[in-house]
Amino acid sequence: MPQLDPAPWFSMLTVSWLIIFLLIMPTILFYQPQNTISTKQVTKPKQSTWTWPWH
């Protein structure tokens, strides 16, 4: 069973995770959101019922 032999795929897995952690993650963590997070309580607007003349 070739899946049990870790020689061909384990090094590729390790290198790909190192690339993700060393190159991509710092770029993503450096990103700052443009909008500030609001702590204001969000309330749903009260909607009145719509009466439809059915006759």
Swiss-Prot record:
What are its GO biological-process terms? proton motive force-driven ATP synthesis
Entry's Pfam families? Answer: ATP-synt_8
All disulfide bonds of the chain are none
UniProt GO cellular component terms: mitochondrial membrane; proton-transporting ATP synthase complex
Compartment annotation? Mitochondrion membrane
Q: Which UniProt keywords apply?
A: ATP synthesis, CF(0), Hydrogen ion transport, Ion transport, Membrane, Mitochondrion, Transmembrane, Transmembrane helix, Transport
Question: What molecular function terms (GO) are annotated for this protein?
Answer: proton transmembrane transporter activity
Q: Which residues cross the membrane?
A: 4-24
- List the membrane topology term(s): Single-pass membrane protein
Record has Iron as a keyword: no
| Chief subcellular location | mitochondrion
Q: Which family does it belong to?
A: Belongs to the ATPase protein 8 family.
Known role: Mitochondrial membrane ATP synthase (F(1)F(0) ATP synthase or Complex V) produces ATP from ADP in the presence of a proton gradient across the membrane which is generated by electron transport complexes of the respiratory chain. F-type ATPases consist of two structural domains, F(1) - containing the extramembraneous catalytic core and F(0) - containing the membrane proton channel, linked together by a central stalk and a peripheral stalk. During catalysis, ATP synthesis in the catalytic domain of F(1) is coupled via a rotary mechanism of the central stalk subunits to proton translocation.
Subunit structure and binding partners: F-type ATPases have 2 components, CF(1) - the catalytic core - and CF(0) - the membrane proton channel.
| UniProt-recorded name of the protein | ATP synthase protein 8
Q: Which organism is it from?
A: Petromyzon marinus
